[in-house]
């Protein structure tokens, strides 16, 4: 066992990694020669390739191998050099797939490039054809120009052609000059066309600006509801708890009326625009007719003057024949002149009538716009006064006092606001209100109030004498209304009594027995 352990230790010592210094632990054994202290200096040793470190350590620095082949065989034999370090997840199959995908992409790119080259070739072929066509056209134009040349030049060219069958450079230069002349003419025509197009564009812009101005004027004229809404939003009133539901109802009705007015304004704007366009077209047609008539008149006058000028020359008179005498010819010419003048006068009259009609249509449209503006201003003023009176806040609002929308005459689809929450009575009540409550029944009070609300704005400050006069004039008893409302309400019988100079109706719920017996 001891021998095996010694061999194993020796094997481990011999099997140290070559190329690295071997460190040995030197232990002093008793009875050996080296039992004493080491006299050699540190770093110096008798054995070559061994270096001492301290008293107990030695480092082996001798060459590990005698040749390169020994080192190769020691480390596992020969192998190929790898230029770069691959990843741990490297796999040959994955690399093949990747290369295949790359090859497929390259093929696709090649196909795309081939298609592009084909398109380029087709474009080149088309350009070549166009160039050939242009050359043919130039040759044809040159031939046409050569036909228009003088006879002397043609003879010279023919003689030169007899001598030289090939085309001469003079001919080519002439053709080129003619082509340049034609190009210059076409360029001039293009410039004229461009100038006309620019002038037309300017006219169109002017017409558009005019239309925008008219639209702005019309919208400013019909901008009533928007201004009313803005004024309502600007009004600031102290908070009143009792008038909140009424304000909400008024706002809802005002919004609905504004929508109706907006629709009416849009329709009126469209009709006005259509009329303006029609009037402009009529004016243009009238101007064109006038221009044509003036041109015809000038032509006829110029023809007459030319005939007068021609009459100054002396031509030999043709032989007279019994079939076409000279007088008949003069009469025919005079009749044709008269008919042409009559036609021109008719055209002028028609043009003037068209202009008058267009002016009348424009005046009617302007009058309608003015009427609409006046109505709008009146509605705004009335609505402002109504809002001021309604938002002042009275001390008392009578029972069964109903409010109706101011725009009920404009928007008929809305129902009257008779089913509204009634406001609560306040503590301070005037003498006028007390007398009205005690002396006048409900039916007699509500009817004149509704009439006054429908006709005009309700009056707030009324004297006692005025109230009594109104009671004398307006209080009436309607028997038919009582018969119709028997199943809903109790019957109230009014009896007229005299208190001095005042006639007051007092309601009596029960009839006296004496009257019933009678």
Curated annotation (Swiss-Prot):
Domain of life: Eukaryota
Biased composition (Basic and acidic residues): 328-337
Entry coiled-coil feature ranges: 95-141, 188-219, 344-375
InterPro entries: Web
Disulfide-linked positions: none
Region (Disordered): 303-337
Keywords on record: Coiled coil
Family: Belongs to the WEB family.
Name of the featured protein: WEB family protein At2g40480
